[in-house]
UniProtKB/Swiss-Prot annotation:
PROSITE patterns: RIBOSOMAL_L2. Residues 272-281 have a biased composition (Basic and acidic residues). One of the primary rRNA binding proteins. Required for association of the 30S and 50S subunits to form the 70S ribosome, for tRNA binding and peptide bond formation. It has been suggested to have peptidyltransferase activity; this is somewhat controversial. Makes several contacts with the 16S rRNA in the 70S ribosome. PANTHER family: LARGE RIBOSOMAL SUBUNIT PROTEIN UL2M, RIBOSOMAL PROTEIN L2. This is Large ribosomal subunit protein uL2. It comes from Lachnoclostridium phytofermentans (strain ATCC 700394 / DSM 18823 / ISDg). The gene is rplB. The lineage of its organism: Bacteria, Bacillati, Bacillota, Clostridia, Lachnospirales.
Length: 281
């Protein structure tokens, strides 16, 4: 999928780029796999803001994606490649031999008419989903399970892929896109190939309005707020924050403070952090 540019008939249009959607084969989703999506604008069930800078955006419906890929031994034909407004990756509609339909993440290179399959006996080719125990070492994979049967949780965004580095005993070692080296049980499943829509990172939004269409509201600096709104606020002009270091709106240290729990159970599965350092046990 390529990137298209626009004629600069307005200043914001000058640097704007977008996807040409050349891989998309239909604009109408499968009705049986679409549900309504309610907007919460970052509020919880009490109406309190739990996530700032969310609200508005274009209306969208949620496409039910099969991240588990548990239908083993039955081949499926790729019917369409579709746009999904809820994620950066494109999705593929597949139809199994028994008539069941499902959406999966569309890997790079997957074409309409190709067949995909799930299970330990599946062929080693792009789009097939297998346990890590059956995938050759060195393969590029995505949609990786952290726990067997839970469904893919890792490496699902556009253009991403992880590499299967080694297998030892009950665990496989993966190199994630961030550079982190992590162990995952070999009974967990993963899909072969790289997630499609690889040019997504080259898109330049170009103007604030496109960000608002995505449901993202403006982020305001604390230093320009009033002191009752933020610890950095107040003062005449560009006054300093008056603290040893920056803090969050709730007074917690920001920028550089480690937030991961030191006694988290999954720490033992991380062999190397994304910054190249060993994780302190």
């Amino acid at each position: 999928m390529g990137i298209k540019t626009f004629n600069p008939y307005t200043p914001s249009r000058r640097h704007m780029t977008g996807s040409d959607f050349a891989e998309i084969t239909t604009s109408t989703p499968e009705k049986s796999l679409v549900v309504s999506l309610k907007k919460n604008a970052g509020r919880n069930n009490q109406g309190k803001i739990t996530v700032r800078h969310q609200g508005g955006g274009s209306r969208r419906k949620y496409r039910i994606i099969d991240f588990k890929r548990k239908k083993d031994g039955i081949s499926a034909v790729v019917k369409t490649i579709e746009y999904d407004p809820n994620r950066t990756a494109n999705i593929a509609l597949i139809c199994y031999a028994d008539g069941e339909k499902a959406y999966i993440l569309a890997p790079n290179g997957l074409q309409v008419g190709q067949t995909v399959m799930n299970g330990a006996t599946a062929e080693i080719k792009v789009g097939n989903c297998l346990p890590l125990a059956n995938i050759p070492v060195g393969s590029q994979i995505h949609n990786i399970e952290l726990y067997p049967g839970k469904g893919g949780q890792l490496v699902r965004s556009a253009g991403n892929s992880a590499q299967l580095m080694a297998r030892e005993g009950k665990y496989a070692t993966l190199r994630l896109p961030s550079g982190e080296m992590r162990m995952v049980p070999i009974s967990c499943r993963a899909t072969l190939g790289q997630v499609g829509n690889i040019d997504h990172e080259l898109v330049t939004l170009g103007k604030a309005g496109r960000v608002r269409h995505m449901g993202i509201r403006p982020t305001v600096r604390g230093s320009v707020m009033n002191p009752n709104d933020h610890p950095h606020g107040g003062g005449e002009g560009k006054t300093g924050i008056g603290r040893p270091g920056p803090v969050t709106p709730w007074g917690k240290p920001a920028l550089g403070l480690k937030t991961r729990k030191k006694n988290k159970q999954s720490n033992k599965m991380i062999m190397r952090r994304r910054d190249g350092k060993a994780l302190s046990k």
